[in-house]
Amino acid sequence: DYIMANPPFNLKDWRTDEKLTKDIRWNGYGLPPVGNANYAWILHMLYHLDQTKGVAGFLLSNGALEDEDTLAIREQLIKNDKVEAIFILPREMFYSTDTSVTLWILNQDKKGGLRNGRQLRNRENEVLFVDLRTWNQNNSTIKTDKSKKTFVVFNEEQIKAICDIYYGWQTYTEIEPYDKPELYHAASID
């Protein structure tokens, strides 16, 4: 099964100090902090994925990658080999905010095999990092009642290139590391 989501970023005071402290969704990961719900969303999605082959793709603010209050949960997600890929997107991808965002892909089964007609290699203990912050050349403008807002839009060629990076990594069979400096890097979690 698949989950796609764009949860509210950095939601504060999403629970009281006592509420949900023993929630089953946090088992094995720890309690997400009261001051930011980003990792509550992540663990909620992970809990609801098919445990054998579920995949989730979702957007979060870039701060979720470095928040000290969630370091232990983030480390456990990596240790449990749930994170498949992280795509850092350009600023101003949304017309309503200029917040920097990251596309996360979680995968319950990174083993090789035939998936959706494609032969995938074993990607266990690897995470693909893709830095698209400089891919901000294509802009679109929207008029609101009071002003104009410009935001970044990927064109078809860029979308194809992003898919090629991700799909290429999933099927990569060369001995050399899957790496293009300043664009993408496949990191071992061993």
Where are these regions (language model features)?
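A conserved structural/catalytic subdomain of Rossmann-like adenosyl-cofactor enzymes
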Residues: 1-190
